[in-house]
């Protein structure tokens, strides 16, 4: 079953998000460059991955601004990492998550690192996959 999609406000932009699972840990999954919270559940392997994460946590997923079901942005105003970090914070606020483990994949890992450094009190743990802190 696909979780209900809701929207958080981040500045003037609406950010699509979903919450599934009832575990004791809030886990925010930060996707890579492209995502779609509803279509993710249609790909069997990816859906299995999300279900596994939700089996031990309250899993919070979202589409970054300009992707998936979140509001579009003009091509000449692509979002900065800081704006996308604010989107992550807005989603956490919308679901009343005071502290969460943040799991970022690819570009989502860079975003997760920035969030953890900016909001250490709101970050229980940081997990990254396929990410880098500095391009060399």
Residue positions per predicted region:
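Short, hydrophobic/aromatic-rich segments at coil-to-beta transitions
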Residues: 1-6
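Conserved HGGG/HGGXW glycine-rich cap/lid loop of the alpha/beta-hydrolase fold
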Residues: 7-71
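Short, glycine/charged-enriched secondary-structure capping and boundary segments
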Residues: 42-45, 74-77, 116-117
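Active-site phosphate/pyrophosphate- and oxyanion-stabilizing loops and adjacent acidic/basic residues
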Residues: 47, 51, 89, 113
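Catalytic nucleophile-loop/oxyanion-hole region of alpha/beta-hydrolase
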Residues: 71-85
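Conserved acidic catalytic loop of the alpha/beta-hydrolase fold
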Residues: 82-100
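Conserved hydrolase catalytic core segment
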Residues: 98-136
């Amino acid at each position: 079953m696909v979780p209900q999609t809701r929207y958080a406000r981040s500045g003037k932009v609406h950010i699509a998000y979903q919450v599934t699972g009832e575990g004791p840990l809030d886990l925010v999954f930060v996707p890579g460059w492209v995502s779609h919270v509803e279509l993710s559940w249609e790909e069997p392997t990816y859906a299995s991955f999300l279900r596994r994460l939700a089996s031990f946590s309250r899993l919070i997923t979202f589409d970054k601004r300009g992707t998936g079901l979140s509001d579009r942005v003009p091509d000449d105003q692509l979002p900065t990492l800081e704006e996308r970090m604010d989107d992550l914070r807005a989603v956490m606020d919308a679901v009343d998550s005071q502290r969460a483990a943040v799991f970022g994949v690819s570009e989502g890992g860079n975003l997760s690192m920035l969030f953890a450094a900016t909001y250490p009190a709101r970050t229980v743990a940081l997990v990254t996959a396929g990410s880098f802190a500095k391009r060399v």
